[in-house]
Amino acid sequence: MNLQDHFLIAMPHLEDENFQRSVVYICENNEQGSMGLVLTQATDLSIAELCAKMNFMMADEREYSDKLVLLGGPVNLEHGFILHKKTAQEFQHSYKVTDQIYLTTSADIINTFGTAQSPEKYLVTLGCARWEPNQLENEIANNDWLVVPADEDILFDVDISERWFAANQLLGIEHVNFSYQQQMEHS
């Protein structure tokens, strides 16, 4: 099964602080491994503040998003990753995840923020999550993750604090069911 364009939903027993109660969007899954972005951990930095720190604020009174930058995972924390809807403009380092969703790592996309060329919907992360070949598949087989096809509303519109619950609901699972199951397992 190709996991690209799927959500990984952390099972409640997954206690790794990088992934506890997380939803990860898988951007790439192939024989070389997997790469994804954690969608449930915000930094305390807004996109507007990030643009200011990177000197992208222009004198033309652009309006920048006050959405928070996400902590995309424990790997490459010094790199930014912008997941966005397809745009008419092409960017220097973009990877097509689906026909409508792209992952861009070049700063030229940030220069479009606050303009008509900006992607209609986007999120910004610092860092990403990576897995060696077959590592993610083994974690799934060990019941660390549930897998469900990605949903654009959850990806771009649902509040960060609600994404884990919303992704579980795609599978028809209520979080109360997990709490009950965990209590039974520990009895």
Swiss-Prot record:
Coiled coil: none
Domain of life per record: Bacteria
One Pfam family from the record: DUF179
Entry's Gene Ontology cellular component terms: cytosol
SUPFAM superfamilies for the chain: VC0467-like (SSF143456)
Classification via InterPro entries: AlgH-like (IPR003774)
HAMAP family from the UniProt entry: UPF0301
PANTHER family cross-referenced by the UniProt entry: UNCHARACTERIZED PROTEIN YQGE, UPF0301 PROTEIN YQGE
Family: Belongs to the UPF0301 (AlgH) family.
Protein name, UniProt field: UPF0301 protein HS_0009
Organism per entry: Histophilus somni (strain 129Pt)
